């Protein structure tokens, strides 16, 4: 499984040659400035999710708040019949809280998909300068 990141990552299950071809095609898209493959070991990956959950009574509301606290999520909106939770974390963490909240009734949910940065002090621009990689005829 390969992850190619250009803003939002694209997950593909392919060989190295096909992954390089896809990366080359992505570099031609506007406004892609840079493409870099990141391995799970060499990157920090997170996903942002907002979940609007039905919480029509105080008992449900308290349980939803407790679940949010356990996962270090934030309550970002409150109404008479619902709570909206924001959580940032690994895909497994997001999946786990989603599963727990389904019993209350998920009214709406949005997920960014996985975003990633390389670990350490180097940046994608540093790596591209070392490779002499060009986009739009300009060295990045």
Model-derived segments and spans:
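Long, contiguous binding/interaction regions
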Residues: 1-7, 11-140
């Amino acid at each position: 499984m390969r992850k190619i990141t250009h803003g939002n990552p694209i997950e593909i299950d392919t060989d190295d040659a096909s992954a390089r071809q896809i990366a080359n095609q992505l570099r031609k898209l506007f406004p892609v400035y840079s493409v870099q493959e990141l391995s799970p070991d060499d990157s920090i990956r997170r996903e942002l999710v907002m979940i609007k959950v039905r919480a029509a009574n105080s008992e449900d509301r308290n349980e939803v708040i407790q679940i949010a606290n356990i996962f270090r999520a934030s309550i970002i909106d409150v109404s008479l019949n619902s709570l909206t939770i924001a959580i940032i974390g690994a895909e497994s963490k997001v999946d786990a809280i989603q599963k727990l909240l389904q019993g209350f009734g998920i009214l709406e949910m949005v997920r960014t998909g996985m975003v990633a940065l390389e670990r350490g002090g180097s940046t994608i621009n540093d790596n591209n300068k070392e490779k002499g990689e060009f986009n739009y005829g300009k060295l990045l």
